[in-house]
């Protein structure tokens, strides 16, 4: 996965990574050989990253701390951090934001069993305390259908169902 937020991504800072592949063979690859793209990398689900060398930008300690506090507050204000979730449920589609499309379809607060489209941020599916994997799967499918029916865009889940 090429995780990212607030204008930065792992592809921007990864110099190299060491990992175990599915055959438990230790491998190493340079950052530019990891096939990073939007929310994707060449790592397979069975690969385990053991370590990574990251190249970060130097900065003034207090400025970095202030930026961290700013981003933490921004997340608290806009994301449902008070409930369990798997984070962002859908990848950003071309031409818009999944959360805006879900909200536009009137799905904030929509529930299937114990799974709910967050009322705080429509891009998150939260667990109200008793959600099953089936609840989450059905909710994701319902959201995809509703958004597709309204916009013609099929949202791609960011959550990997195992």
Task: Report each predicted region and the residues it spans.
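A gly/ser-rich beta-alpha-beta helix-loop segment of oxidoreductase catalytic cores
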Residues: 1-15, 85
């Amino acid at each position: 996965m090429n995780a990212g937020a607030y204008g930065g991504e792992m592809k921007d800072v990864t110099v190299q990574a060491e990992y175990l592949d599915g055959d438990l063979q230790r491998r190493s690859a340079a950052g530019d050989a990891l096939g990073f793209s939007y929310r994707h990398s060449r790592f397979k689900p069975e690969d385990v990253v053991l370590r990574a060398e990251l190249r970060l930008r130097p900065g003034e300690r207090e400025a970095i701390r202030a930026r961290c506090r700013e981003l933490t507050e921004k997340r608290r204000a806009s994301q449902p951090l008070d409930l369990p979730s798997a984070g962002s449920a859908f990848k950003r589609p071309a031409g818009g934001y999944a959360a805006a499309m879900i909200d536009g379809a009137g799905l904030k607060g929509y529930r299937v069993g114990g799974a709910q489209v967050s009322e705080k941020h429509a891009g998150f599916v939260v667990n109200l305390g008793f959600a099953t994997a089936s609840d989450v799967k059905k909710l994701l499918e319902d959201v995809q259908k509703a958004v597709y029916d309204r916009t013609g865009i099929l949202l791609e889940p960011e959550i990997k169902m195992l």
